[in-house]
Protein backbone atom coordinates (compact mmCIF):
# COMPACT_ATOMS: atom_id res chain seq x y z
CA UNK A 1 0.00 0.00 0.00
CA UNK A 2 2.84 2.44 0.77
CA UNK A 3 5.15 1.21 -2.00
CA UNK A 4 4.70 4.55 -3.76
CA UNK A 5 6.40 6.26 -0.80
CA UNK A 6 9.43 4.00 -1.27
CA UNK A 7 9.94 5.41 -4.76
CA UNK A 8 10.72 8.87 -3.39
CA UNK A 9 14.37 9.83 -2.96
CA UNK A 10 14.25 11.22 0.57
CA UNK A 11 17.09 13.39 1.92
CA UNK A 12 19.41 12.00 4.58
CA UNK A 13 17.06 13.64 7.11
CA UNK A 14 14.10 11.75 5.65
CA UNK A 15 12.58 14.79 3.95
CA UNK A 16 11.55 15.80 0.45
CA UNK A 17 11.00 19.37 -0.84
CA UNK A 18 7.43 20.11 -1.86
CA UNK A 19 6.17 22.81 -4.23
CA UNK A 20 2.57 23.92 -3.69
CA UNK A 21 1.08 25.21 -6.94
CA UNK A 22 -2.34 26.80 -7.34
CA UNK A 23 -4.27 24.41 -9.56
CA UNK A 24 -6.37 27.05 -11.31
CA UNK A 25 -3.60 29.50 -12.22
CA UNK A 26 -0.33 27.56 -12.10
CA UNK A 27 1.06 30.12 -9.62
CA UNK A 28 3.70 28.70 -7.29
CA UNK A 29 2.42 29.47 -3.80
CA UNK A 30 5.14 28.13 -1.54
CA UNK A 31 7.88 25.57 -1.01
CA UNK A 32 7.95 23.43 2.13
CA UNK A 33 9.14 20.02 3.34
CA UNK A 34 7.44 16.71 3.99
CA UNK A 35 8.54 13.56 5.71
CA UNK A 36 7.04 10.17 4.90
CA UNK A 37 4.21 10.57 7.42
CA UNK A 38 3.29 14.04 6.14
CA UNK A 39 3.06 12.85 2.55
CA UNK A 40 1.04 9.78 3.52
CA UNK A 41 -1.38 11.95 5.54
CA UNK A 42 -1.65 14.45 2.68
CA UNK A 43 -2.61 11.66 0.28
CA UNK A 44 -5.06 10.12 2.75
CA UNK A 45 -6.75 13.32 3.96
CA UNK A 46 -6.69 15.39 0.76
CA UNK A 47 -5.25 18.45 2.53
CA UNK A 48 -1.60 19.53 2.73
CA UNK A 49 0.36 18.34 5.75
CA UNK A 50 3.99 19.46 5.94
CA UNK A 51 6.95 18.84 8.21
CA UNK A 52 8.06 21.95 10.08
CA UNK A 53 11.83 21.86 10.38
CA UNK A 54 11.82 24.77 12.86
CA UNK A 55 9.15 23.25 15.11
CA UNK A 56 10.20 19.64 14.55
CA UNK A 57 6.64 18.43 14.03
CA UNK A 58 3.90 17.87 11.49
CA UNK A 59 2.15 21.04 10.40
CA UNK A 60 -1.26 21.02 8.77
CA UNK A 61 -1.32 24.02 6.45
CA UNK A 62 -3.93 26.43 7.77
CA UNK A 63 -4.17 24.88 11.25
CA UNK A 64 -3.87 28.35 12.81
CA UNK A 65 -4.93 30.66 9.97
CA UNK A 66 -7.67 28.60 8.33
CA UNK A 67 -5.84 28.96 5.01
CA UNK A 68 -5.88 25.25 4.20
CA UNK A 69 -4.68 23.74 0.94
CA UNK A 70 -7.02 21.22 -0.65
CA UNK A 71 -4.86 18.83 -2.65
CA UNK A 72 -6.22 18.00 -6.09
CA UNK A 73 -3.16 16.18 -7.40
CA UNK A 74 0.21 14.93 -6.16
CA UNK A 75 3.09 14.62 -8.63
CA UNK A 76 6.75 13.66 -8.40
CA UNK A 77 9.54 14.96 -10.62
CA UNK A 78 11.71 12.93 -12.99
CA UNK A 79 14.47 12.49 -10.39
CA UNK A 80 11.93 11.38 -7.77
CA UNK A 81 13.27 13.94 -5.28
CA UNK A 82 10.73 16.79 -5.45
CA UNK A 83 6.97 16.61 -4.91
CA UNK A 84 4.46 18.94 -6.57
CA UNK A 85 1.05 19.52 -5.01
CA UNK A 86 -1.66 21.06 -7.15
CA UNK A 87 -3.90 22.77 -4.62
CA UNK A 88 -6.89 25.00 -4.06
CA UNK A 89 -5.79 27.65 -1.57
CA UNK A 90 -8.44 28.56 1.01
CA UNK A 91 -8.76 32.27 1.74
CA UNK A 92 -6.42 33.21 -1.11
CA UNK A 93 -3.47 33.48 1.30
CA UNK A 94 -0.65 30.92 1.32
CA UNK A 95 2.13 32.97 2.92
CA UNK A 96 2.46 33.63 6.66
CA UNK A 97 3.15 37.27 5.73
CA UNK A 98 -0.48 37.62 4.63
CA UNK A 99 0.28 37.51 0.90
CA UNK A 100 -1.18 35.27 -1.78
CA UNK A 101 2.14 33.46 -2.23
CA UNK A 102 5.60 33.41 -0.67
CA UNK A 103 7.47 34.72 -3.73
CA UNK A 104 6.64 38.40 -3.27
CA UNK A 105 10.12 39.89 -3.74
CA UNK A 106 11.93 40.45 -7.04
CA UNK A 107 15.62 41.16 -7.58
CA UNK A 108 15.89 44.62 -9.14
CA UNK A 109 19.16 46.50 -9.55
CA UNK A 110 20.95 44.33 -7.01
CA UNK A 111 18.33 44.49 -4.26
CA UNK A 112 15.16 42.63 -3.28
CA UNK A 113 12.03 44.69 -3.92
CA UNK A 114 8.60 43.78 -2.54
CA UNK A 115 6.14 43.64 -5.44
CA UNK A 116 3.14 41.83 -3.97
CA UNK A 117 0.69 43.39 -1.50
CA UNK A 118 -0.22 42.14 1.95
CA UNK A 119 -3.82 40.94 1.62
CA UNK A 120 -4.35 40.57 5.35
CA UNK A 121 -1.97 41.67 8.11
CA UNK A 122 -0.37 38.69 9.87
CA UNK A 123 -1.41 39.92 13.33
CA UNK A 124 -5.06 39.78 12.26
CA UNK A 125 -4.52 36.21 11.04
CA UNK A 126 -2.44 34.81 13.89
CA UNK A 127 -3.08 37.33 16.68
CA UNK A 128 -0.61 39.74 18.21
Swiss-Prot record:
Textual note on the cofactor: Binds 1 Mg(2+) ion per subunit. Binds 1 zinc ion per subunit.
Cofactor(s) needed, names only, are: Mg(2+); Zn(2+)
- Keywords for this protein: Amino-acid biosynthesis, Cytoplasm, Histidine biosynthesis, Hydrolase, Magnesium, Metal-binding, Zinc
- UniProt organism field: Methylococcus capsulatus (strain ATCC 33009 / NCIMB 11132 / Bath)
Q: Which GO terms describe its molecular function?
A: magnesium ion binding; phosphoribosyl-AMP cyclohydrolase activity; zinc ion binding
EC number(s) on record?
A: 3.5.4.19
Look up keyword Amino-acid biosynthesis and say if it applies.
yes
Matching entries from InterPro entries are given as: PRA-CH, PRib_AMP_CycHydrolase_dom, PRib_AMP_CycHydrolase_sf
Q: Which Pfam families match?
A: PRA-CH
**Where is this protein localized, as stated in its record?**
Cytoplasm
Predominant cellular place of this UniProt entry's protein: cytoplasm
| Biological or metabolic pathway of the protein | Amino-acid biosynthesis; L-histidine biosynthesis; L-histidine from 5-phospho-alpha-D-ribose 1-diphosphate: step 3/9
Q: Which reaction does it catalyse?
A: 1-(5-phospho-beta-D-ribosyl)-5'-AMP + H2O = 1-(5-phospho-beta-D-ribosyl)-5-[(5-phospho-beta-D-ribosylamino)methylideneamino]imidazole-4-carboxamide
Q: How does it assemble?
A: Homodimer.
Could you list the residue ranges forming a coiled coil in this record? none
What is one GO cellular-component annotation here? cytoplasm
How is this protein named in the record?
Phosphoribosyl-AMP cyclohydrolase
